Amino acid sequence: MAFSKKTRQEAITKIQNEEMDLLVIGGGITGAGLTLQAAAAGMKVAVLEMQDFSEGTSSRSTKLVHGGIRYLKNFDVEVVSDTVSERAVVQGIAPHIPKPDPMLLPIYDDEGKTTFDMFSVKIAMDLYDRLAGVDEDSPYANYTISPEEVLRREPLIKKKGLQGAGVYLDYRNNDARLVIDNIKKAVEDGAQAISKMKVIDFIYTDGQISGIRARDLLTDQVIEVKAKLVINTSGPWVDKIRYLNFTRPIVPKMRPTKGVHLVVDAAKLPVPQPTYFDTGKHDKRMVFAIPRENKTYFGTTDTDYHGDFTDPKVTQEDVDYLLDVINFRYPEANITINDIEASWAGLRPLLGGNSGSDYNGGDNGAVSETSFNAVVEAVLRYKNKTATKAEVEHLLNNMESSLSEKGDAPSSVSRGSSLERESDGLITLAGGKITDYRKMAAGAMELICQLLEEDFGLKYEPIDSKKYQISGGEFDPTKVEEVVAENMKVGVAAGLTEEEAKYIADFYGMNALQVFAYASEMEAYEGLSLAESARLCYALEDEMILTPVDYLLRRTNHILFMREGVDAIKVHVVNAMADDLGWSAEEKAEQEKALEEALRESDLSDLKK
């Protein structure tokens, strides 16, 4: 399926000449998921993104499909139940992206009041497994380990006060890949998806929005697109879209916060599995340290943000905070700013009335001390075989019902998100977590189908989005390893090494077969390996890359987790893209400059001076 700069102008022409049923503003995970569901239902749908797909927020997360175990500190059962249930759905529709990766949660007794102790962490993990449907005999069932075992796994971790640790199931994620594979499936189903296209104005008919004006940031051309419905899924930008033309008095919905992550070499901070721990600053926060691609990254911060949404920066204050936290937890590592190889800063699109972040918990829906004690007692009785599993489930189900949002307004799609239609017809889908994206889109689809039928006489049926697999994920989710092994053979036959073929098969899912097809047909680009050349060719032909940063940062993880290799290939990537996309000498120089700026920003060169 071609999805490239070559097809981009065709899409622009098409949306100018045909009225869309639905126009989606914002190509992050929420807009991508909604566009896929709309296209699969047969709608004429277009999604416009002013940057690269996922560039604004959705590629800047902690890169987990996180179960939110910290919420169980307050027994916010409904949040965790929703999250782990939806996580299982996402793993089923995108089995090549979220991968199980058990999390280690160390426990200390010398740091004052902490999130968990050894007793409460076991209770929380048992509840977590029950909510996640993890059986006791599953290889992913939770367990506790001794201080000695913790130190065997992580010899640099703080020894004083260590009581042991809990280990429970969590999932690593490739956030940018999740977005682009939703977009690609939507395009395959007939959607028009255009990046570098900024919505600048609304078109009105009789006081109702009937389309948009947008500026093509590649050509500066302004286009008009007619649409029956327009939905705003622009993440932290939703208020800015709502403010366009100042046509409506609005109450701001968003309270964005900034999260920062830092990357060091695994030799400097050897962490064999994801680890989740209190900061030690008595600020009621927890931080992750996560291994990936022979690197370890750690974060996140969580601070209110009022700066430039397009490109939030890592500040010295952010670095100081995270270095203090990581060196407190791993005192022998002695990490300094000069050890940082890469970094990223992103915004969380939190609703103003729901400022507790995805990772740091909150007291929304917290239960009373009485309910807390009742649950603990029930679980202990179950462990001692004096209560049945059904009795525990009955208690939890009653608690979930009391905490659920069933009594809320219909506009509430899920906790931390909202769906509203304003007086001029603009629909806004805001807030939420990456894990919630499919569920949020499904909730919006119900409203969209209703409006299209009532107002325009068009009848569409939403798809079963719980089973509709995204691009690259079209295989049995219980057979990930078998599929990778089988596809890997194709890569080896195409001339790649076993290591290269396995990496690509794991990274792209079923789309690896197209990467391998390019490898078998092409000569390697000058200065690049055949594997790198095939990946770049695939990104150019099928993944709408328009800049070197699109490829090196979001379609791959090179800038974040293979920083030492980027300098060796960056010139050759630019040269290959310049030839393919027909850049002039001036355009090529601009792209080289933009890439160098992105690298300097990522490796914190300005702060290291």
Curated annotation (Swiss-Prot):
InterPro entries: DAO_C, DAO_C_sf, FAD-dep_OxRdtase, FAD/NAD-bd_sf, G3P_DH_FAD-dep. One of its GO terms (cellular component) is cytoplasm. It is an enzyme of class 1 (oxidoreductase). It catalyses: sn-glycerol 3-phosphate + O2 = dihydroxyacetone phosphate + H2O2. GO terms for molecular function: glycerol-3-phosphate dehydrogenase (quinone) activity; glycerol-3-phosphate oxidase activity. FAD binds at residues 21-49. Its cofactor is FAD. Keywords: Cytoplasm, FAD, Flavoprotein, Glycerol metabolism, Oxidoreductase. Signal peptide: none annotated. The keyword Signal does not apply. Coiled coil: none annotated. GO terms for biological process: glycerol metabolic process; glycerol-3-phosphate catabolic process. Its EC number is 1.1.3.21. It is found in: Cytoplasm. Belongs to the FAD-dependent glycerol-3-phosphate dehydrogenase family. This is Alpha-glycerophosphate oxidase. It comes from Lactococcus lactis subsp. lactis (strain IL1403).
